[in-house]
C-alpha cells in the first residue's frame, strides 16, 4: 500500500503550495469538513457555536486550529510513510481525549482533496490527486491500527 518515490514527489510538490498559507488552507479544509459533515462539528467544543460559513471564516480560533491540523499532517507527509513517531501521539490524543472516529478522518481527507483541487488545479491533476488520496489512506490506516492497539473502536 506504500507510495512510490514518484507518488511521494507529487504529494510533496502540491504540499509545497499548501505551505505558502497553511492557516488559510487549514481554515478552508475545516469549513468544508463542517459544511459537508455537520456532525463533525460536535467534536469541537470551541467551534460548536459557529453556524454559518461567514462565522467560520471570521473565527481566528478556527484558522489557528486549521494551521495546527495541516502543520501536523505536513510533518507526517514529509516522512513518506515512515511516520510512526508522529502517528503515535496523534492517535493517542484523537482516540482517548478527542474520541475522533476514523470515519471523520476520511471526511477530512475528502475535504483536503477538495481544497487542493479548488486552490491548485494546475498542480493537482489526476496523478497528484491519486497520490494524495493514497498518502491520506496510508495515514488513516496507520491511525486506525493505533486506535485498535489503544482499544478505541473509532
From Swiss-Prot:
Keywords (A to Z) from UniProt: Cytoplasm, Heme, Iron, Metal-binding, Muscle protein, Oxidoreductase, Oxygen transport, Phosphoprotein, Transport
Binding site for O2: 65
Residues holding nitrite: 65
Alphabetical GO biological process terms: removal of superoxide radicals
Function in brief: Monomeric heme protein which primary function is to store oxygen and facilitate its diffusion within muscle tissues. Reversibly binds oxygen through a pentacoordinated heme iron and enables its timely and efficient release as needed during periods of heightened demand. Depending on the oxidative conditions of tissues and cells, and in addition to its ability to bind oxygen, it also has a nitrite reductase activity whereby it regulates the production of bioactive nitric oxide.
Quaternary data: Monomeric.
EC number: 1.7.-.-, 1.11.1.-
Main location, first listed in the record: cytoplasm
Any one GO cellular component localisation term in the record: sarcoplasm
Designated name of the protein: Myoglobin
Amino acid at each position: 500500500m506504500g507510495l512510490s518515490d514518484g507518488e511521494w514527489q507529487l504529494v510533496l510538490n502540491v504540499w509545497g503550495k499548501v505551505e505558502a498559507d497553511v492557516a488559510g488552507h487549514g481554515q478552508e479544509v475545516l469549513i468544508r469538513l463542517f459544511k459537508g459533515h455537520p456532525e463533525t462539528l460536535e467534536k469541537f467544543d470551541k467551534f460548536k457555536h459557529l453556524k454559518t460559513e461567514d462565522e467560520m471564516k471570521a473565527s481566528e480560533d478556527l484558522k489557528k486550529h486549521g494551521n495546527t491540523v495541516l502543520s501536523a499532517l505536513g510533518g507526517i507527509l514529509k516522512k513518506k510513510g515512515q511516520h510512526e513517531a508522529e502517528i503515535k501521539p496523534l492517535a493517542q490524543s484523537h482516540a482517548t481525549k478527542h474520541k475522533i472516529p476514523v470515519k471523520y478522518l476520511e471526511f477530512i481527507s475528502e475535504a483536503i482533496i477538495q481544497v487542493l483541487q479548488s486552490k491548485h488545479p494546475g498542480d493537482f491533476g489526476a496523478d497528484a490527486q491519486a497520490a494524495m488520496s493514497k498518502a491520506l489512506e496510508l495515514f488513516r490506516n496507520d491511525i486506525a491500527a493505533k486506535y485498535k492497539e489503544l482499544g478505541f473502536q473509532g
